[in-house]
Amino acid sequence: MGFLKTCVFRRNACTAVCFWRSQVVQKPSVRKISTTSPRSTVMPAWVIDKYGSNEVLRFTQNMMIPMIHYPNEVIIKVHAASINPIDVNMRSGYGATALNMKRDPLHVKIKGEEFPLTLGRDVSGVVMECGLDVRYFKPGDEVWAAVPPWKQGTLSEFVVVSGNEVSHKPRSLTHTQAASLPYVALTAWSAINKVGGLNDRNCTGKRVLILGASGGVGTFAIQVMKAWDAHVTAVCSQDASELVRKLGADDVIDYKSGNVEAQLKSSKPFDFILDNVGGSTETWALKFLKKWSGATYVTLVTPFLLNMDRLGIADGMLQTGVTVGSKTLKHFWQGVHYRWAFFMASGPCLDDIAELVEAGKIQPVIEKTFPFSKVPEAFLKVERGHARGKTVINVV
């Protein structure tokens, strides 16, 4: 049924990684992992061997099962995963320069050694193995997580993640439902809470505008803003208006029915704007913020990774710094805050999100599910855009 593995860990690494967790579990020093076949050291996975279009996706039965290398890591048996736009972009090589620097800061490896690369950021599954310093989880726990993009992804039978990136799955959700949330939820949480400074204590009555409201990030953002008693205006297409209203949006603007800027002129100013669209949006959106009141515009569409792909690490970071610095200063003098936000993997934040889920304040929004054998079709679905929620992969 399985095999035994004994791992030697770096004793001085991350000894306090789970200080924010209160529950302690006891683990034996040698544990057992159940795999697809007896004595197996390989697993099924979807990988890419080079960057490109959908044809580069390849199914293999021979991907090496991940090993625990640090004492704060856990191995999860993947029950469900999901496809995000970042996965489609990474398949095509987006962000490769910066992500490879994160994978190999000393540039020891030669170019292309990130392959075979497994995509997929979301996971809901069961803990199979725990590092020696993991105290909050034990084998058999049902968990969910979002894996940082520089790590091997979740479109495989097993995935290894840091313990501080993992959270106990909400009991009210199936694995399929749970896999739809972590990446988009943490991205929205980063923008709204960590960067925007909004929370359940200061959000009541705030006027919030969400641009690109019908995708994964937008549908989560609507729900968390309504859970915190904000007034939400959602911008999406007409065919998504019923969805966002069901999620709690107070006002809905159809961007296809006319100029959004013109439609917003009759609205009161906003305290917070979340931009999932980018492009020319920021050239007009900020003027709808309340001036000199602490109002904030946060965009999730930034040139950070593209700059490094195009200019290299040093010049790309310099260009990025100049861009965000100049825009921040420009809008500061106009009485509003301009900010960028990014996905941040965080088990503690997922704990907070799980509480909202269990309280019935957050519902997963799933547009379509695919079996593990249909991963390429799922990528094409996400690549076509116009999402009405998430695309989920049932691995088990």
Curated annotation (Swiss-Prot):
Residue ranges of domain Enoyl reductase (ER) in the record: 52-393
Entry-linked SUPFAM superfamilies: GroES-like, NAD(P)-binding Rossmann-fold domains
SMART domains: PKS_ER
Known catalytic reactions: a 3-demethylubiquinone + NADH + 2 H(+) = a 3-demethylubiquinol + NAD(+); a 3-demethylubiquinone + NADPH + 2 H(+) = a 3-demethylubiquinol + NADP(+); 3-demethylubiquinone-10 + NADH + 2 H(+) = 3-demethylubiquinol-10 + NAD(+); 3-demethylubiquinone-10 + NADPH + 2 H(+) = 3-demethylubiquinol-10 + NADP(+)
Residues engaged in binding NADPH: 214, 216-217, 237, 255, 276, 300, 341, 343, 386-388
GO BP, one annotated term: regulation of dendrite development
Cellular localisation: Mitochondrion matrix; Mitochondrion outer membrane
Any matching Pfam family: ADH_N
One Gene Ontology term, aspect cellular component: mitochondrion
Superkingdom of origin: Eukaryota
Keyword annotations: Membrane, Mitochondrion, Mitochondrion outer membrane, NADP, Neurogenesis, Nucleotide-binding, Oxidoreductase, Transit peptide, Ubiquinone biosynthesis
UniProt transit peptide range: 1-40
Pathway: Cofactor biosynthesis; ubiquinone biosynthesis
EC number per UniProt: 1.6.5.-
MF term (GO), any: zinc ion binding
CDD domains listed in its UniProt record: RTN4I1
Main location: mitochondrion
Family affiliation: Belongs to the zinc-containing alcohol dehydrogenase family. Quinone oxidoreductase subfamily.
Described function: NAD(P)H oxidoreductase involved in the ubiquinone biosynthetic pathway. Required for the O-methyltransferase activity of COQ3. Able to catalyze the oxidoreduction of 3-demethylubiquinone into 3-demethylubiquinol in vitro. However, it is unclear if 3-demethylubiquinone constitutes a substrate in vivo. May also play a role in the regulation of retinal ganglion cell (RGC) neurite outgrowth, and hence in the development of the inner retina and optic nerve. Appears to be a potent inhibitor of regeneration following spinal cord injury.
Subunit structure of this chain's protein: Interacts with RTN4, UQCRC1 and UQCRC2.
Protein name, entry field: NAD(P)H oxidoreductase RTN4IP1, mitochondrial
